[in-house]
Amino acid sequence: MQTRKTNDSGRPLRSLYLLYHELRPTPSEYSYVVQKAQFEEHLNLFASIRNSPHSELLPDITFDDGHISNFEYAAPLLQDRGIQAHFFITVGWTGHKPGYMDWPELRLLQQAGHRIGAHGWTHTLLTHCSSKDLQIELVDARKTLEDKLGVAITTMSLPGGRFNRQVLAACQEAGYAHIYTSIPKTESLPPGPMVGRLNIRGSMQADWVSSLFEPRSASLARLEREYRIKAAAKNVLGDRLYAKLWSLLNRAEPDAISGNPSDHENTAHH
């Protein structure tokens, strides 16, 4: 959490929320995988930015899905640098899906000072959900996290970044104060109810990531333009066709495929 509100020149500080998914010790063709050594370089960069009195834009780290690499690789590196992150958990996968964290790991992350938020129950796109499905993905997920961890859960990360008015209304009704999206943009301190994030890919090396934090960053402006183009493509193609195209272009692996709220029956009481 940030305590400063301005830099040494009196300029108001802003945050750039960064979205990670999975870390691996070796390279992967799946674009959402970041190498462990690469993540360490990112953290060294972020520590330097945070420690500079001249910085106007500060990094905030988030993880989606709850992959076990978040605990095995990311958590020790974060602890070494005194950096706290925000982990959004796909609740139905917890303790059930191979390669993803169980409740003991989540409790240890929480005890280390990291924040825990919800990322649905099955990772189904919320725009595809009925009212009953939204109850599972939003309310059941939040209540299960609260019961298992003993803390209030007030943050939700949208699977696939997809939302519409119905989804936002359901999130608010379910008790979430902050909704984290995949819209690449900077945020005020503290952020508003809709929080944008920049999706970090394996191709993004530390030198390029550094350019995002430059004043009037051309790299960040390009990502914002690309997001608007992709959003227009989603509107034309529809979610399902766009998701197939996304999987092909990003070399998505089976773990990246969304689930189905009917899976709730298999995991709800464990």
Task: Identify what each model region corresponds to.
Residues T90-T94, S182-E187, I200-R201:
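Short, acidic/turn-prone active-site loops that include or flank metal/cofactor-
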Residues R14-Y30, L58-P59, H67, Q79-V167, ...:
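Metal-dependent polysaccharide deacetylase catalytic core of the NodB/CE4 family, i.e.
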Residues K36-Q38, H42, N70-E72, S130:
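Short, acidic/polar
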